[in-house]
Amino acid sequence: MVDLAAGEEIPVEILSALADENITKWAFNSNFERVCLSEWLRRNYPEYFDSYSVDGDTVGNYLNPRGWKCSMIWSAFMGLRLSLAGIGAVPGLEEQKLKEGKDLIRYFCVPCKATKSNGGRTRNLPEHDEDKCKLFKFYNQRDVEVEQSIQKKLVKYPVPDFVWEEFWLD
């Protein structure tokens, strides 16, 4: 895990891999991750951002979707639930998504209302609640572990190539 808020930097090999369509990146709802990372790379590391485009595509200023696969698509193909928490309920899956996640995301990722009690800030930073920050990091790590557990469970049931082709078009 790289803590950008604490001043840590993403290793160059990770930055390069993000834009390399020959390296498959996995996430649950990977289009969300791909679009967010596209914007972040464009702003912070434009030298590592590689946009794709095809004729008639009005949203081609993102990382190429061919470098991404999605566990939510895999789950849908298998007829499973379409939430990470829902799939985490699959029998035998050791790692489970943390229920505190929504509150932590709201605290650290959504602007807050400036009040007298919070010193007029509009953004909660790690130093405003170190315990919540530690839990937030653990929550993010756990999501990765749940994602990896899902892939291990589903590995015997691969998604056909035509489904990935449709996913990349979408």
Q: Where is each model-derived feature located?
A:
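Mixed-charge, glycine-rich, non-catalytic linkers/tails in nucleic-acid processing enzymes
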Residues: 50-68, 74-79, 102-170
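Catalytic-loop motifs flanking and including active-site residues across diverse enzymes
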Residues: 33, 84, 143-146
